[in-house]
Amino acid sequence: MKLNLHFAFFVTDYFIQENKIKYLYLMNYIKKLQQSDEFEYCEGATSEEIQIVETSLGVLLPEVYVKFLSECGSCNFGDTYINGVYKEDGILSYPIIELTKQLREELNLPDDFIVLNYEIDEYLILYKVSKTDHLNDSKVYDAEIHCNKDGNFVMSKPTLLFNSFDEYFEDFLELADDY
């Protein structure tokens, strides 16, 4: 019994440490990009503001994305954005809610996706979320938007782009390295 209990503590401690490392990893990148003139970010979202996002969209946000929101709300590098909660100089808006709801209505975006980034006529980046489970992280997808023969915009089936938000964020950071 002691061996099993010891193993359980070891495994639990390992997962706690792994999550702390992932969070520090994300924070270190944000600090790195704060030094760039091209990187713009907002004030971090409060837990109440994050709850508004979840309630408004009827989803539970993955923990990694919650940590991102609490660190910098939303951000951009040049003309590439990661949507979230915009909070700066007393102005508060929720582009993640607005854009996700708009595309749910206009394109029948499934309820288990939120819109991380959308550039009209270029690309749509989606983050898989759950309505019932608090996930640690989830997959990031892209989808194409095109006009059908009736003149209506339609969305293609989402295809896997990254296995995690962390991978997506790393790709975002490469913009700074390439700049």
Cite the ranges covered by each PLM segment.
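Alpha-helix N-cap recognition
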Residues: 157-171
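Short Gly/Pro-enriched loop/turn and capping motifs at secondary-structure junctions
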Residues: 121-123, 132, 147-148
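Compact, glycine/acidic-enriched structural inserts
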Residues: 146-151, 156
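N-terminal amphipathic/basic-hydrophobic helices that include classical n-h-c signal peptides
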Residues: 1-25
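A short alpha->loop->secondary-structure connector
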Residues: 131-137
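A surface-exposed partner-binding patch
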Residues: 22-125, 175-179
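Short aromatic-glycine-(Arg/Gly/Cys) micro-motifs in beta-strand/loop hairpins
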Residues: 140-142
